């Protein structure tokens, strides 16, 4: 606009001068009779016009200065706001990659133009080359409405464009225009390296090269543009040596064309020069005979003089502008020229290309594109993955609170697909090979994170189901176990069965829902084993729960029977008659038949059992009846031992009236002893086996050893095969009971012998011996009689001895005397020494020396180093596996294997005492034993308790 205004003012001044010359000529031709007044007016008008012109020129300069300043301010403001154009490479060859105050970076320029970033490959780049001050910037400004700086002729011919300037134009801002520094500037002189570098740079990124040529340079081989063309050809061969490399369109714009000279002639001359240059260009061997159109498409156009034919220039530029519209069928921007550099990666690509060019490295565009693709993909991966991590933070927070994340699968699948789609939408513009590689990397990173969250999700889910199982089944079990303490009512078990069914359905549905919603589609389900295991574990626990509920009902029925039968059975057991088991069977049959229908109705109606299972359980009822009878016998500790002892004492120690027997002199004790012992042994045989079948009455567990003729306890009767469920006491328990009974019987027998011996000794003492003892001890008797103290003490001792002798405890006196005599002199010395008596007088006895066992000398073998073994982390299902689920028999086994930390609440119960130790504890203590007898009993009990091998017998 400035040039047009100046031109307009100059033309106006020239017109005024011409008018003045015309007026002067007319004045000379006029005759002397001319009106001078008119002449003076004309002169005055001319002077006013000249003054106005002078003043106008001054004002015009002021206006120009103001406009320049306003333009600078406007450009600065525009640069800061929209960055329509920028200097991408300055005159020193520095790329705009650092945020400097005087210019923005290329990356910022692209970031500000968000529409351009989204274009992908759908944009075009054009650069213009040519001599300095050849009107390149002016042409671009008129052609693309850019605002590049143009030459100010008042300042003389100088370098206007410095380095490389870039502008973003077009309705969609899809055209990038690069204005390159002139090729023959005086400042560079003979330094052609910068010219060559920016030419190579434009070839690397631009699909169209405009070569600005003056018309008078056409045909002159030494013109600067010819060397420029040579550079372009050589550099293009250097860059694009692959068969599939894109072509480049070179548009020759011939400026200031001669209107008198046909354009076709100019074109043919220029084309001839181009072919000469192409023939002389050094080419690789593979392209020695390659024509120029293999690499370039050549287009030619011309424009009139800008100053002399400005209107025509503007008109033809408008026509030329249509060829740069992509919608035009004859557009210069054809897809075959596209260098396929994504819009969002253009800044990085140009930076890398210029860095290689500037450092004089071999420029490998495929490698640069691959490098760009890798960098941009890595950048995308980092950004997308950071966003991905922010979005999954919601899951991590939920997991940290030990809560399951609902709809885990949908959330992860949608998030994964969303992020992969975002990546592919942006990265698909780059090299397919690199994009696929980086897409796999991003996918792997996200799936690793999802997999980790999936493991946490499944662990929490399985623990949640385990807690549900434990809470549900154990709580329910505690309820129906508590029910057993109340009256037997099978209808109450209906509610427990319904609750258990509801628990099972609820837990199954919850687990199916959680497991279905927790397995993302894109990861490998490494919890299949745990899922299948937990499925079977849930079914197994339901099976155990149903079985335990049925067992609880049967146990309740057993206790019910036991409570009914106990008052009837205990008198029979205490009497221990021969027909005891016959009477027991009668009572059991009557009691069972009265309550069996109630049990059957409870199993069918309350527990919803089918007829086959009910029939099976009723067939097993015999086991519960046997168990009830067994519980009645064993609930009293030492019941059988007491019966045997009472039976033995009632026969051996008591008479028919139940009073203690008084033995007669020389009475045979063996007959009542063996009789009482035989009767007591029958009780042991009677209670060895629960005889619920009449055939069982024929079984006997005491036999005679044919070799020795002594009785022995056998494990199984010789006349049949027994049912192990009916065995009341094992062989070792029977041996223990018999040992205790044997010791008790022997103690009573020894006591009876002592009583009988005392009677015999008392009756055999002669009278003369008594008189002789009295005569010899007369002095002592008199001394005692004179001393009241000794007399009283003597009478007391005599009374005690008399009482002991009368009641059969004379053997205690013998035991005391034996104990006193058994104390050695060394023991007395030890006692005195410990009490501190006669410390200075009595020597301290030597302690007996004990031989220490010599340690075995071990071979000096080198010790192997300790192996540090890492403990295997417990599985989320603990020790439960598919293989051992079927072996689970109880909730305790199941929860122990599954590794549940929360112990279910159970009511305390008293375990049944061990029968063997119980039998040993309950050895009859009605008789008093001496120390030696007690040691004898303990030794025999220990021996008996160690006899626990099958089919082992013991003779007595």
Swiss-Prot record:
Residues 906-929 are annotated as: Disordered. Belongs to the TRAFAC class dynamin-like GTPase superfamily. GB1/RHD3 GTPase family. RHD3 subfamily. The keyword Nucleotide-binding applies. Residues 1-764, 810-956 are cytoplasmic. This is Protein SEY1 homolog 1. One of its GO terms (biological process) is endoplasmic reticulum membrane fusion. InterPro entries: G_GB1_RHD3_dom (IPR030386), P-loop_NTPase (IPR027417), RHD3/Sey1 (IPR008803), Sey1/RHD3-like_3HB (IPR046758). Residues 8-84 form a coiled coil. Probable GTP-binding protein that may be involved in cell development. It comes from Entamoeba dispar (strain ATCC PRA-260 / SAW760). Its EC number is 3.6.5.-. Residues 120-358 form the GB1/RHD3-type G domain. PANTHER family: PROTEIN SEY1 (PTHR45923:SF2). GTP binds at residues 130-137. Residues 786-788 are lumenal. HAMAP family: Sey1.
């Amino acid at each position: 606009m400035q040039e047009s205004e100046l031109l307009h003012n100059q033309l106006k001044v020239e017109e005024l001068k011409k008018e003045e010359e015309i007026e002067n000529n007319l004045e000379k031709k006029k005759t002397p009779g001319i009106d001078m007044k008119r002449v003076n007016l004309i002169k005055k008008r001319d002077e006013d016009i000249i003054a106005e012109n002078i003043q106008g020129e001054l004002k015009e300069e002021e206006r120009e200065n103001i406009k320049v300043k306003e333009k600078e301010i406007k450009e600065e403001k525009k640069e800061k706001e929209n960055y329509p154009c920028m200097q991408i490479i300055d005159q020193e060859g520095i790329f705009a990659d650092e945020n400097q105050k005087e210019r923005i970076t290329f990356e910022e320029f692209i970031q500000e133009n968000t529409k351009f970033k989204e274009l992908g490959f759908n944009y075009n780049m054009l650069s213009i080359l040519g001599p300095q001050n050849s009107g390149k910037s002016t042409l671009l400004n008129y052609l693309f409405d850019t605002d590049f700086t143009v030459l100010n002729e008042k300042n003389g011919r100088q370098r206007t464009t410095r380095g490389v300037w870039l502008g973003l134009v077009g309705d969609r801002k899809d055209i990038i225009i690069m204005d390159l520094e002139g090729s023959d500037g005086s400042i560079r002189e003979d330094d052609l390296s910068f010219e060559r570098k920016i030419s190579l740079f434009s070839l690397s990124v631009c699909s169209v090269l405009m070569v600005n040529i003056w018309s008078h340079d056409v045909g002159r081989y030494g013109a600067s543009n010819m060397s420029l063309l040579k550079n372009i050809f050589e550099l293009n061969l250097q860059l694009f040596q692959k068969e599939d490399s894109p072509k480049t369109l070179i548009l020759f714009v011939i400026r200031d064309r001669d209107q008198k000279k046909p354009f076709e002639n100019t074109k043919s001359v220029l084309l001839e020069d181009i072919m000469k240059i192409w023939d002389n260009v050094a080419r690789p061997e593979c392209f020695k005979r390659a024509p120029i159109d293999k690499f370039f498409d050549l287009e030619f156009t011309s424009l009139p003089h800008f100053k002399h034919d400005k209107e025509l220039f503007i008109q033809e530029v408008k026509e030329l502008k249509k060829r740069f519209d992509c919608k035009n069928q004859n557009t210069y921007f054809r897809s075959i020229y596209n260098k396929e550099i994504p819009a969002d990666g253009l800044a990085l690509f140009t930076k890398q290309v210029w860095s290689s060019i500037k450092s004089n490295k071999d420029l490998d565009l495929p490698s640069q594109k691959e490098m760009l693709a890798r960098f941009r993909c890595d950048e995308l991966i980092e950004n997308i993955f950071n966003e991905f991590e922010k979005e999954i933070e919601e899951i991590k927070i939920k997991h940290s609170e030990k809560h399951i994340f609902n709809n885990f699968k949908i959330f992860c699948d949608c998030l994964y697909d969303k992020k992969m789609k975002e990546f592919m939408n942006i990265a698909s513009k780059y090299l397919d090979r690199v994009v696929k590689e980086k897409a796999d990397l991003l996918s792997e990173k996200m799936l690793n994170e999802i997999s980790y969250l999936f493991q946490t999700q499944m662990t929490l889910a399985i623990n949640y189901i385990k807690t549900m199982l434990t809470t549900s089944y154990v709580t329910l079990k505690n309820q129906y176990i508590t029910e057993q303490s109340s009256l037997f009512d099978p209808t109450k078990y209906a509610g427990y069965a319904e609750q258990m069914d509801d628990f099972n359905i609820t837990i199954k549905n919850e687990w199916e829902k959680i497991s279905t919603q927790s397995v993302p589609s894109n990861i490998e389900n490494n919890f299949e084993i745990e899922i299948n295991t937990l499925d079977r574990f849930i079914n197994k626990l339901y099976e155990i729960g149903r079985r335990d509920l049925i067992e609880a009902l049967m146990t309740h029925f057993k206790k019910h029977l036991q409570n009914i039968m106990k008052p009837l059975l205990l008198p029979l057991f205490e009497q221990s008659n021969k027909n005891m088991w016959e009477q027991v069977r009668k009572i059991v049959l009557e009691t069972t038949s009265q309550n069996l229908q109630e049990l059957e109705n409870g199993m069918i109606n309350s527990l919803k059992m089918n007829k086959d299972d009910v029939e099976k359980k009723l067939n097993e009822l015999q086991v519960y009846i046997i168990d009830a009878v067994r519980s009645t016998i064993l609930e009293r500790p030492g019941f059988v031992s007491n019966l045997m002892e009472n039976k033995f004492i009632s026969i051996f120690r008591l008479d028919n009236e139940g009073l203690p027997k008084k033995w007669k002199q020389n009475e045979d004790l063996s007959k009542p002893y063996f009789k009482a012992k035989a009767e007591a042994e029958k009780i042991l045989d009677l209670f060895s086996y629960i005889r619920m079948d009449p055939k069982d009455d024929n079984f006997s567990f005491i036999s005679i050893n044919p070799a020795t003729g002594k009785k022995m306890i056998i494990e199984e009767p010789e006349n049949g095969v027994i049912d192990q469920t009916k065995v009341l006491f094992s062989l070792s328990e029977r041996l223990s009971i018999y040992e205790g009974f044997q010791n008790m019987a022997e103690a009573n027998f020894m006591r009876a012998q002592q009583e009988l011996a005392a009677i015999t000794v008392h009756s055999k003492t002669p009278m003369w011996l008594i008189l002789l003892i009295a005569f010899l001890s007369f002095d002592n008797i008199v001394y005692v009689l004179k001393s009241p103290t000794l007399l009283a003490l003597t009478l007391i001792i005599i009374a005690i001895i008399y009482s002991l002798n009368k009641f059969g405890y004379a053997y205690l006196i013998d035991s005391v005397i034996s104990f006193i005599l058994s104390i050695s002199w060394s023991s007395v010395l030890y006692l005195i020494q410990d009490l501190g008596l006669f410390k200075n007088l009595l020597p301290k006895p030597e302690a007996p020396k004990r031989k220490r066992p010599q340690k075995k000398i071990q071979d000096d073998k080198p010790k192997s180093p300790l192996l540090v073994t890492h403990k295997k982390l417990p599985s989320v299902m603990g020790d439960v596996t598919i293989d051992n689920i079927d072996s689970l028999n109880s909730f305790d086994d199941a929860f122990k294997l599954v590794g549940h930390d929360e112990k279910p609440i159970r009511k305390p119960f008293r375990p049944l005492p061990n029968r063997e130790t119980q039998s040993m504890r309950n050895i009859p203590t009605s008789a008093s034993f001496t120390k030696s007898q007690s040691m004898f009993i303990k030794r025999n009990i220990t021996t008996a308790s160690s006899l626990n091998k099958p089919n082992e017998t013991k003779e007595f």
